[in-house]
């Protein structure tokens, strides 16, 4: 009994590592943030939309991570032999089946509910496939990954007639920067991707801060002098400072460990970007659930890798 329980626990752990569980949680924050930002009067009865929305984001992210490791099987055998598929803890065929089911079921949940966001979910699923199977190792790889996360954010925004593409574009740009940096996290030894990646991230954060202060992004009675605006922009500034601090260490010592730390910080910072935006537009109380999401993702990331 003990041996069987132990094997079962190790199998579950392998699957949680495969899907990058901390990142799955940050994916839920993307779409939920989009919904909350443009629906400031949301109430508990909106859970019939919020729960499927979060579920779709998490399913598509998990499916994408599984497909990532299926596609990179040969590379991981040489560079990351301890990962679930090359180590034999998860069968490649099982991971491929899981990815295929997730990429169909995810958009299907919103389509079943006749939500307009289902069209965006389908586009996101297609983008996930294109990134993992064709674009990842090309010059378009970072742009494709940024598009995936931008679409995930846009999926929540689409529930409002006020939605625009500016916020998801700027958010996706930040992910482009993370992805640029991640390309050197295995080999290390070069700052060729780190510096441009950090510059892209800073440009994205500046754009997000500016968009949060624009008239179209806030309720009619919002005033830029309000405390919530200062606090929200300060949170975005803190994200920038944290990235630059970790980035400086990676520049000084461009080893795999320091670069992986920079990438991990960037991934977990995605939730804080949402916290900053929601705080600036709607106030701190509306952002508290997203702080809780970050705490959960951070605690899990101490045990499971997020990149």
Please annotate each region the language model reported.
Residues 29, 33, 55, 59, ...:
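Hydrophobic faces of alpha-helical transmembrane segments in multi-pass integral membrane proteins
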Residues 29-36, 41, 76, 80, ...:
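Flexible domain-boundary/linker segments
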